[in-house]
Amino acid sequence: MAKNRHLFTSESVSDGHPDKIADQISDAILDAIISKDPDARVACETTVTTGLVLVAGEITTSVYVDIPKIVRDTIKEIGYTRAKYGFDAETCAVLTAIDEQSPDIAQGVDEALESRSGNEIDAAIEAIGAGDQGLMFGFATDETEELMPLPIFLAHGLARKLTELRKTNKLDYLRPDAKTQVTVEYDEFNQPVRIDTIVVSTQHHPDITQEQIAKDLHTYLFPEVIDASFLDEDTKYFINPTGRFVIGGPLGDAGLTGRKIIVDTYGGYARHGGGAFSGKDPTKVDRSGAYAARYVAKNIVAAGLAKKVEVQVAYAIGVARPVSISIDTYGTSDYSEQELIDGVNALFDLRPAGIIHMLDLRRPIYRQTAAFGHFGRSDLDLPWERTDKAEALKKLIVK
């Protein structure tokens, strides 16, 4: 590797990975509830293991949803439909342990501190307080058209295409569980110049050879996802490097909601506040705050105000207004942090109810985000991925 160059690696997983099964079940339940009761409070956690699904959490709603049916339908859609996979949508046990949201939390969400103390500026927006304290990050970079870091973008692309090859029976020996990883080489100007390493581990039928899998992935997977200009004779490929991946899914490893937070976001390229997304209604700022921060970051880069930016927003439980907002452009902007923050505050309402209204979050849009990343999804119409405020933001800041 040339002097002053460096490597960065990100990973993704398929929709059949145990942790992603759990995420998708949690979000499928959330969608089912919020489609009937947009104001429901949902904090839904799922655990999957051999032959068993446990759904637990706190849900406050006036509607009924058939949780076992949602669980089985989700597992079936993912592709676990045979007992020999060690996990079958029809025969697995489904247990539920659901309580209501704590009234101590509810009182701070239902009526924010600003409203309770008489300091509200906008009564309708400040009536809702943050569902928890915490810090969230949003990130954007001009490395890709989607304004995402290249390593995670390619890792997601490989995982998504691999799933397509399985579900369309193009490669009918593939099974649902899989992981991908991409290492990108950056030059001295921090621009991606080549792919150094690709790792793919995919569950498969026991009778297929590793040589056939490797041949097929080089034919049907890599050329469909990765621009040939990034590949060279020194690019390394590791395909099922253990030599066998027959036992997978919940039979191989237990899965849990919220255990793939780096896969869900920026692949480690940006910081993470620690809060997971799936199974949480939009009053939970772990989710809505991170979506809003991405929305802000993406519009800053789309406006040409920075080449790369990380936005942090933080909240106190039961308080509507963020306790802090910070913006780091890594030296790629001609404008000060305060100039950018002033522009953001003028255009983006980062109070929980403001975010919910701005991004129209009381809708069943979450199940689709629970695999292959929440950001940079050009295959989906996600409100936090829009750059509709870029021009207005530019006019506010550029004098």
Curated annotation (Swiss-Prot):
Pathway: Amino-acid biosynthesis; S-adenosyl-L-methionine biosynthesis; S-adenosyl-L-methionine from L-methionine: step 1/1. Residues 101-111 are annotated as: Flexible loop. ATP binds at residues 17, 177-179, 244-245, 253, 259-260, 276, 280. Binds 2 divalent ions per subunit. Binds 1 potassium ion per subunit. InterPro entries: ADOMET_SYNTHASE_CS (IPR022631), S-AdoMet_synt_C (IPR022630), S-AdoMet_synt_central (IPR022629), S-AdoMet_synt_N (IPR022628), S-AdoMet_synthetase (IPR002133), S-AdoMet_synthetase_sfam (IPR022636). K(+) binds at residue 45. Pfam families: S-AdoMet_synt_C (PF02773), S-AdoMet_synt_M (PF02772), S-AdoMet_synt_N (PF00438). Keywords: ATP-binding, Cytoplasm, Magnesium, Metal-binding, Nucleotide-binding, One-carbon metabolism, Potassium, Transferase. It catalyses: L-methionine + ATP + H2O = S-adenosyl-L-methionine + phosphate + diphosphate. L-methionine binds at residues 58, 101, 253, 284. It is found in: Cytoplasm. One of its GO terms (cellular component) is cytosol. GO terms for biological process: one-carbon metabolic process; S-adenosylmethionine biosynthetic process. Gene3D superfamilies: 3.30.300.10. Its EC number is 2.5.1.6. Its main location: cytoplasm. Its cofactor is Mg(2+); K(+). One of its GO terms (molecular function) is magnesium ion binding. PANTHER family: S-ADENOSYLMETHIONINE SYNTHETASE. HAMAP family: S_AdoMet_synth1 (MF_00086). Belongs to the AdoMet synthase family. NCBIfam families: metK. Catalyzes the formation of S-adenosylmethionine (AdoMet) from methionine and ATP. The overall synthetic reaction is composed of two sequential steps, AdoMet formation and the subsequent tripolyphosphate hydrolysis which occurs prior to release of AdoMet from the enzyme. Homotetramer; dimer of dimers. This is S-adenosylmethionine synthase. It comes from Listeria monocytogenes serovar 1/2a (strain ATCC BAA-679 / EGD-e). The gene is metK.
